[in-house]
């Protein structure tokens, strides 16, 4: 039972890390896109 909870915790931590990376890349992409649009003056 202890091992099960340990793996469950590890799994959730892994998901949180993946989500953090996803949001980080999304944030960078949005900033880059906004800069491109501003430079092109649409």
Curated annotation (Swiss-Prot):
GO terms for cellular component: membrane. The chain crosses the membrane at residues 15-35. Keywords: Membrane, Transmembrane, Transmembrane helix. It comes from Dictyostelium discoideum (Social amoeba). It comes from the Eukaryota. It is found in: Membrane. It is a single-pass membrane protein. Its main location: membrane. This is Uncharacterized transmembrane protein DDB_G0286783. The lineage of its organism: Eukaryota, Amoebozoa, Evosea, Eumycetozoa, Dictyostelia.
